């Protein structure tokens, strides 16, 4: 199995990159692709850049050039579920855009015309993530809806609006729905693994800078365990 792992920022890929054996680097359109083996599994690690356009562009290049069997999106997120704390992990069941509004034409809020209202993560990958999460102690691992938009969620009014639109929302970030949409078009299974670096709307900019490394460590740990689970 050829496993693709996508992180937006240097902090989100650095830990896994250092663990890739026989690593080779390819740069396309300012996106970095690292190929090699992780605990014996064939992997390609992509540093996509931040935001939906960078994520969609780089994921398209990834799928065209490297043809992975599955895609895992990793990194940090802002927490929405009241039960979760900084450092906890969310496994996606579904992913949605929280900044798309074509409701005037009868579409669901967050739905891009011609696309599903929500993008369902692959059940096998969700199960592999849950099985792997059983080996991690001292943090909560939840599964649920993750929403994506090209804004950092620091405004309490915006947080309240998004929460109203998606009452079942667990976390928000800036790439996953774009990655999911490209995977949908290519018919490639995906899952999103995000550790919380902040709680949306609650001094989130300060918390993000302080806890990004902690979030990256937790999400990278689960992704590595998951790679081993998938490679059995």
UniProtKB/Swiss-Prot annotation:
UniProt key word Ribosomal protein: no
Annotated catalytic residues: 12, 198
Signal peptide: none
Catalysis: reaction(s): S-adenosyl-L-homocysteine + H2O = S-(5-deoxy-D-ribos-5-yl)-L-homocysteine + adenine; S-methyl-5'-thioadenosine + H2O = 5-(methylsulfanyl)-D-ribose + adenine; 5'-deoxyadenosine + H2O = 5-deoxy-D-ribose + adenine
Pathway involvement of the protein, from the record: Amino-acid biosynthesis; L-methionine biosynthesis via salvage pathway; S-methyl-5-thio-alpha-D-ribose 1-phosphate from S-methyl-5'-thioadenosine (hydrolase route): step 1/2
Assigned GO CC terms: cytosol
Keywords from the UniProt entry: Amino-acid biosynthesis, Hydrolase, Methionine biosynthesis
Matching InterPro entries: MTA_SAH_Nsdase, Nucleoside_phosphorylase_d, Nucleoside_phosphorylase_sf
HAMAP family listed in its UniProt record: Salvage_MtnN
Family in the record: Belongs to the PNP/UDP phosphorylase family. MtnN subfamily.
The name this protein goes by in its record: 5'-methylthioadenosine/S-adenosylhomocysteine nucleosidase
Record organism: Anoxybacillus flavithermus (strain DSM 21510 / WK1)
Top-level taxonomy: Bacteria, Bacillati, Bacillota, Bacilli, Bacillales
Record gene name: mtnN
């Amino acid at each position: 199995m050829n496993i693709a792992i996508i992180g937006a920022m240097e902090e989100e890929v650095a830990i896994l990159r250092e663990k890739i054996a026989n690593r080779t680097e390819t740069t396309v359109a300012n996106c970095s692709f690292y190929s090699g083996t992780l605990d014996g599994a064939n992997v390609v690690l992509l540093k996509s850049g931040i935001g939906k356009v960078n994520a969609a562009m780089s994921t398209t290049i990834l799928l065209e050039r490297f043809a992975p069997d599955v895609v895992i999106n990793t990194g940090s997120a802002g927490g929405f579920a009241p039960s979760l704390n900084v450092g906890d992990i969310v496994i996606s069941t579904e992913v949605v855009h929280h900044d798309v509004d074509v409701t005037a034409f009868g579409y669901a809020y967050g739905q891009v015309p011609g696309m599903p209202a929500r993008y369902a993560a692959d059940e096998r990958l969700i199960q592999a993530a849950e099985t792997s999460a059983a080996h991690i102690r001292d943090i909560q691992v939840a599964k649920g809806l993750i929403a994506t938009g090209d804004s950092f969620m620091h405004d309490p009014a915006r947080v309240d609006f998004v929460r109203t639109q998606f009452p079942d929302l667990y976390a928000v970030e800036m790439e996953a729905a774009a990655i999911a949409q490209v995977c949908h078009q290519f018919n490639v299974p995906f899952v999103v693994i995000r550790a919380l670096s902040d709680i949306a709307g609650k001094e989130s900019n300060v918390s993000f800078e302080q806890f990004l490394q902690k979030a990256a460590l937790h999400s990278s740990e689960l992704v590595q365990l998951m790679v081993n689970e998938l490679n059995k």
